[in-house]
Amino acid sequence: MTSELVGFLQRNGHLIGRFAPIPCGFLRKARAVLVVVAPGQGAQSPGFLTPWLDVPGVAERLEWLSLVSGVDLIEHGTRSDADTIRDTAVAQPLIVGAGLVTLLSLFPHPSGAYASISAGAGHSVGEITAAVGAGVMTAEQAMVFVRERGRAMAHAAAVTKTGMSAVLGGDPDEVVAAAREVGLTPANMNGSGQIVVAGTIEQLASFVAPDGARVRALEVAGAFHTEHMAPATTILGKIGNAITTHDPRIRLISNKDGQVVHDGREVIRRLVQQVSQPVRWDLCMQTMLDLGVTAMIEIPPAGTLTGLAKRAMPGVETLALKTPDDLPAAWKLIEKHGVHSVIDSTPTWRLVIAPAKGTF
């Protein structure tokens, strides 16, 4: 029998109880752990919502969210061209709205989601979708917030001509050092050998990728998740203060540092701050691994995050929910990996107060 460390509690010199650490082996047995993730800007493509309109209730929900946001989600999700949906003020509400309606198709009853999902996360604007899924704020609050986020970031991007480039491969430390040498910000640390750098057009032009790395310019409106977005942070801070929140009902993993956030107000604060701070998706994936995640479902417009996970999280079963045809496979994955409260939220010690039977 293995020995056990036991601590004793005293009050006024009298022994009142003891506590014993629970061996980690009892808490971390092999089990199924499901995470649902929401993609960010750039994942959208023309017509990606078209097949979803055949799902009962989706069109009506999209119409409602369109009214709330002032953006025609059905038009932009089914008929608008690539240039139109690349516009930040269009893309952001479209991505969040699409994620919200497809989440309801995946989990028609929210209680079913909370009983199945162990953790949630979103990349950049996808964090807003994840916050709604976790119960932090309502869909309507999210659509107003993301509408103003898109507008504010578009206005901030218009001040100075800026952009972003993806750096693929190479040593991450060398890529970051080379970027900072010319004044660029490593705006997205995506893991799996992908770093997105951002800054002025002149800075991007002067960037020289280290050996083994290649650079691909991104078609975005500006240097998101950098100091160039500071004006947007100021605007969103005022809006965020007006949002009534609830604490997350699942583990919500933050882009800022990969930490699990348990306080609803803190979630909103981080959503405000993240527009001018780097996205640390690499740390989010590391947290998922630390939590023992065994499966990941990515909601529409899906594909980007599961692609990163396949390289950075080997052994984790992934599913990109692209069309309604993927729903049966997603439900099967939920049945296999969805277990209520399986991620450890209990402390690694237990307090026992005498006289409890068997204490002494």
Where do the language-model regions lie?
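Ala/Thr-enriched low-complexity intrinsically disordered regions
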Residues: T2, A20, A30, T346-T348, ...
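FabD-like malonyl-/acyl-CoA
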Residues: F26-E174, L218, A295-D325, A356
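Alpha/beta catalytic cores of group-transfer enzymes, especially the acyltransferase/condensing modules
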Residues: Q41-A43, S69, D81, G133-S276
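Acyltransferase
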Residues: R214-I299, G303-G307, T318, D326-P328, ...
